[in-house]
Swiss-Prot record:
HAMAP family: Flippase_ArnE. Keywords: Cell inner membrane, Cell membrane, Lipid A biosynthesis, Lipid biosynthesis, Lipid metabolism, Lipopolysaccharide biosynthesis, Membrane, Transmembrane, Transmembrane helix, Transport. One of its GO terms (cellular component) is plasma membrane. The chain crosses the membrane at residues 37-57, 65-85, 91-111. Translocates 4-amino-4-deoxy-L-arabinose-phosphoundecaprenol (alpha-L-Ara4N-phosphoundecaprenol) from the cytoplasmic to the periplasmic side of the inner membrane. This is Probable 4-amino-4-deoxy-L-arabinose-phosphoundecaprenol flippase subunit ArnE. It is found in: Cell inner membrane. GO terms for molecular function: carbohydrate derivative transmembrane transporter activity. Pathway: Bacterial outer membrane biogenesis; lipopolysaccharide biosynthesis.
Length: 111
């Protein structure tokens, strides 16, 4: 499997796990135990899948090259929080995201 594709799967699964945890907190506030358990279960599945694929990825890429790309999760989770959960994202957040994207592009030159 292509290393980039594997890395994208890791990023997607990790992000999905974080979003599932956030959704579980909404269900928890509403005292919807069944929904909370479903979201927590999905979170565990996504995060465990991401971890297993991460271990596979580390067989092919050095940690020093692969790990910085997990910063994409910070960007995706921030954007998802803003669009799906209506969380406020300040100008400082947007500037930070821009800086991270530049850093990821610079680091990506080595892969």
């Amino acid at each position: 499997m292509n290393h980039y594709l594997l890395l994208l799967f890791v990023i997607f699964l990790t992000c999905a796990g974080q979003l599932s945890q956030k959704q579980a907190t909404h269900s928890w506030k509403e005292n919807a135990k069944r929904q909370t358990l479903i979201w927590l279960g999905l979170s565990v599945i996504f995060l465990a899948g991401g971890m297993l694929l991460w271990l596979k990825l580390l067989q092919y890429l050095p940690l020093s090259q692969a790990y910085p790309f997990l910063s994409i999760n910070l960007i995706l989770v921030t954007l998802s929080g803003h669009f799906f959960f209506k969380e406020k994202v300040t100008l400082q957040h947007w500037l930070g995201i821009g800086i991270m994207m530049v850093g990821i592009l610079l680091l990506g030159q080595g892969i």
